[in-house]
Amino acid sequence: MFTVNKKPVVYSTRDGAEVLKGKISLVLKTLPSLFVLPPTPIQDGSDYTITPMIFVENGQLRLGQPQVPFSDQLELIKDEPNQLEVDFLKKLYIISKIQSTINDFEMQPDMGKNFALFELETEFGSVDETVWYNRLFDVQKFQQMVEENAAEVTLESRTTDLWAGVTPSFTPTAFVTNKINLETEIPNLRQESELMVFDTIRVNATVVACFYQDLIKYNQDFNPWIKDYLAQDKLLTKKLRASDIIRLMIAGTTPRKKYKMINVYVYPETISFTVEMLLNFDSTNGADNLKKLIKTIIVDMGKEDAYDQRVEKEYYYGSYSAPINVPIFVVKDLLTNDSNVYNIAYINESALINTRRSNLNLFLKNSSKDLKQHVGVSLFERPDTVGTFVRLKKIRGGAELQTTIDTSMGVVNKLLQYSVGKVAQVFNYYQTYINIVANLDPTVDLNREKENLLKVQAPEIFLPNYTRLCNKPPVIIEGEPQPEDGTILKFPIYGEAEPRYYKCPYPNYPHPGLRRNTTLGNRDTFPYVPCCYQRPQSMNKNYNTYYNQAVYEQRINSGEIGKTLKILAPKRIGELPPRINKLLSYSTKLKFYRYGFKTSLYSVLDVLNTATGSAATIEAVRRELSTRVELCKGEISSLQTGEIAEKIMDPATYVNPRLFKRALEDYYNLSIILFSKDQDDFSVYANKFLKFICPLRKRVVFMIEHEQAQHVELVLDEETLGHVNKQGSRPILTWDRNDFPVKKLFALYKDRFTHTLYDIGAKRFVSIHNLLMESSLTGTALEGLKRNTFHVYPWETISPNGKIVKSVQPLNQYTDSYGQTRLVEFRWKELRFVSEFQPLPCLAIAQVPEADPNHYTKPLEYFIQVNDKLTEEERATIREAFAWCNLYRTPLVSDADYRSPYYEFRRVKKLAQYILWAACHAYAQTYQTRPLSVMEWIDQDTRVDPNFSYSRVTISPLFNLDQFTVDSKFIFNSVQLQERVMFNLRLISTVNLKVYAANVYHAFYQDVTNFTVPYPAQLALSKTEYYQRTREPLIVQVLSDENVPYLRAGTLYVLENLFGIYSGNLCLFELSLEKLFEKSEQLFQQAVPPNTRVNIVLFNQGVPEYYVLGQNAPELDVIILNINNLWFYGLLRPKLTDM
């Protein structure tokens, strides 16, 4: 105990500065912010004199130092936290000064008041006397603040005493650091929003993709990584979208880590870049490299000035195990209902409404008012293994790191021990209302067996069922021992978890090594796990692959032929895919094989250099190809010639034989017949409507591409391969165009590229070859039809003399992201209407002089509005006149299923915000040209229409004001909404109107052209659009009883009569339902929500068996086949005649 102004204060060694100030303020009857502690640390048994600026005595305000001016006293306490407002403090000072002077004058209060006012005027220059006359309110307010502070200090003191008496009865394991997050925080100097920051991020060969909400800015050279990221857990994707995080995908620098993610958090005052750092390589160099990377990103964004004001932080994440069994629902109840608990910890709204029973996220309170500085805790209920598994998150690094860790562990351990004593009370309370089951058995000591001890010490590595992989588990030894004869293993070393040292306690198995992790749930993070072996492991493949990053290539044995379809090592010989092998064998009567080359992005150049005997360097070939970029425009129509040339010269670009085929053929002066390993067939062009032009040159070469792996191999016949690897032999690796195999293959090659036409009667595409065979046209008319493959559109017919006749005049067209026409506007008589089509080649529509010079490139909203103006009679007339017409209408979503009120509330709330932003933007734009008042704008430019619906309003980063206007009037659907918007508009200052007019509350862009997307970046407005633009084309095959044994996954088939009522349906096959649903979303834009009704037809023993999974709409039809003991899952699509 110590004294302050001769008043006793209880002292405790655990009291910090904030607690001491609270206790002292209690005896001085003031606030902690109105005094400073002595310069020397407070000690037990000492006497101190502390003078507060203002305090309460006998119901009146008193000045601690009446002779010291207000400015000097304010300067003394200015650095104290939770400071009062200066104006309020000045009022309290004036009241206290006058009251103290009156008390000094005793019997002459008026003289004392006047004297005090005279002194105050001398000090301040002038004094508002009404402060004294209205003092009652201010005095009561201050006294109430003092009383609330006293109650809070008393409660905290009582809580502190309670927690001081709680002693954990268990011994936790050591804290293990799992990861470190580096954070670079820069000031948000331009007050940018998330969308504006997303727009400034540059995508290149380092930052390969950027994600925000549904927006994706990407470098298409890294599509496999991006698709892998987008295909991850949907729950994680929802969390990222809900938290408004911008995520950057960074190209990895090691084979083990393909890419790294950087999270960008945008706040009104700051922008934070956070990246996870690997733990166990050189931490100094690793941190420096990551900081340099973040600096490069920030500089590329044009924020050098903000980077100079950066603040760099480190946050540590780790875990430990507490051998105590506490039901998580008990802890959650105490956090919300027990004042002793929620004074040291709290949970947010997400955890409050979460129904998970086995884990809980909470935060520990500290002295900081910034919630971002509170340590996060995750509790996992593990009664059968470790008791309670605890994760500590976001612990600020620095000199106090270990102290913070120890303090946080102490608080959590006390919380768990306190909760154990409340289990029966909480359990009995809930048991009276609901039937609740909890495991209340004490935790068993798991440290008796080696594998269980490993689960306690490193639970992130040694999951349940680890012993099925390794029945000789090692033990963990403390410290950093020196390896002795390969008997000590350090694992892991790449930052997957805290590194530990392992030793094998078995006399016959003394050598620790690595076992391939093929079954555990953490196999993606830990592809190998420790295990004990009889022999040293330093030369083992697993050991060298992990520790030395060794790459094991296939051995080259003369005459040995690889049976798998994996990429071949250089000079290795391997089999062709089954279908290609059969095609070549039947058509040419020769046996062909694959011939391997070194894996690289320019493997096709190695293949062609070898085939032609060229000694040109890769750089020289790229330079030559860059002069032939116009030959690639057919395959890469979305890029300008300069961009294609830049792409070819970029060493990080994969030289794709499909996209650069014509340039390669021109440079090497040969023709390429290209096969696809992934499609098990001829390779196809990217653009399905590209006219097939392939005149054979003198020399022809056969190649096969691993499309997904981005690698090319040579295809040679058996006789040529017999001379390839012989010393001194230089066989000819190309064919002459007049050779029989080339002629036969070229005929098949061209046949695979038969064009299609639109069958008006059947409303579907048909083969041009079949149409010509069935046609009665002859002579010049037939030749004209052959030359004009794609000149026959649904609204066109061919006259007997071969001329094309249009039944209606097209005016405008809407093209999708592939450049294919989907909507066409027509003029017929006095009517205009829009028809929807399957993908068609772009129309050559001549420009018609109109008010809008770009009338032929109308936005989608224009086509929506055209058909809305038609009456029902006009619609019927159009349908009767044109059988091919499918009038386009915007589908209105109607879901009859139950919709959660919470989600409906969120939707309506978001819509209300969107309407307010739209009104702010509309008024701000009007104000720039016509400075109307808010009331005038409401009267002149808005209208109330109770029948107006916001159903067509789409909330997206691209803002469209036309969704809210009719005849240039902003529409409200109620008077109440109009009044509320008017009230909010009045709160906007004139200075901010220009800002709102420019970028709509910083939250939206008005058009996709507002985005900055320099090469090589591309922008997709949604995941669906991304998949549309990057998906691989599907080749439709026919599935009949003849080729069922050769069924291939990832292929789209047309079913024949073997499948009964499903004959004629399209069916996409995959090897699992999960993969099938994923492909459904990517290719057909058909998402599969949880518990979707799936109608399954099993074809196994000849008799179909029917099953149903789930019960919610929409319904999906799936067939399952067993081919050679391999299960195939097929997603049924509508019949071709129904499409």
From Swiss-Prot:
Lineage: superkingdom: Viruses
Pfam families, per database record: DUF5757 (PF19061)
Family stated for the protein in its record: Belongs to the IIV-6 295L family.
Stated name of the protein: Uncharacterized protein 016R
Species, as recorded: Invertebrate iridescent virus 3
Lineage, broadest ranks: Viruses, Varidnaviria, Bamfordvirae, Nucleocytoviricota, Megaviricetes
